[in-house]
């Protein structure tokens, strides 16, 4: 898949605000501060398209980005640690679960996992949830540039042991772009 055009479309705080299900949706999900927004910016080549922050919990809404006029990339709030109150975190959790359960337009879910901390309990729970719903998902091991080759291989083996039903696993660096071509090639199978 080649990305020619990427624009912010809309943000929603409730399922009632979601756009019509006219385009396939590729969903970015993962723990807070795993690099969902950075990955989105890297893939599209549009710096600042998705807001990034070193503070966990920056993404607080479901953010839609229209890609090539006929696909949505959907950036979801992170799960796990975030610098917000319990009530807001509970709202995010309910929103995330309801969206993934009910949205028919979801073509693929990308589960982003920090390469330095693969297979955390919250990531395994997300994969189990997606498998229960029979949602196709791929795993993106982010922050790949922060590992040595030996650490990268060990993290990959560990991730593979927990993700037998993942359609693919891609090691990705938003900093260098490593993994970008491979990931975009996978999208071809889910956006036709």
From Swiss-Prot:
Transmembrane segments: none annotated. One of its GO terms (cellular component) is cytosol. SUPFAM superfamilies: P-loop containing nucleoside triphosphate hydrolases (SSF52540). PANTHER family: ENGB-TYPE G DOMAIN-CONTAINING PROTEIN, MSS1/TRME-RELATED GTP-BINDING PROTEIN. NCBIfam families: GTPase_YsxC. HAMAP family: GTPase_EngB. This is Probable GTP-binding protein EngB. It comes from Chlorobium limicola (strain DSM 245 / NBRC 103803 / 6330). The lineage of its organism: Bacteria, Pseudomonadati, Chlorobiota, Chlorobiia, Chlorobiales.
């Amino acid at each position: 898949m080649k990305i020619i055009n990427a624009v912010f479309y809309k943000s929603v705080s409730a399922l009632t605000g979601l756009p019509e299900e006219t385009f396939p949706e590729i969903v970015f999900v993962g723990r807070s501060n795993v690099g969902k927004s950075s990955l989105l910016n890297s893939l599209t080549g549009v710096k600042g398209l998705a807001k990034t922050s070193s503070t966990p919990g920056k993404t607080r809404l479901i953010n839609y980005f229209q890609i090539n006029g006929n696909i949505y990339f959907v950036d979801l709030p992170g799960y796990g640690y975030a610098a917000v109150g319990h009530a807001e975190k509970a709202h995010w959790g309910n929103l995330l679960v309801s969206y993934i359960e009910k949205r028919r337009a979801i073509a693929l879910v990308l589960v982003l996992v920090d390469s330095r901390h693969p297979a955390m309990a919250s990531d395994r729970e997300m994969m189990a949830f997606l498998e229960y719903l029979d949602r196709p998902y791929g795993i993106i091991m982010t922050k790949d540039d922060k590992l040595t080759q030996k650490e990268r291989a060990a993290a990959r083996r560990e991730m593979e042991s927990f993700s037998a039903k993942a359609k693919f696993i891609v090691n990705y660096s938003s900093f260098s772009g490593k993994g970008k071509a491979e990931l975009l090639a996978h999208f071809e199978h889910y956006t036709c």
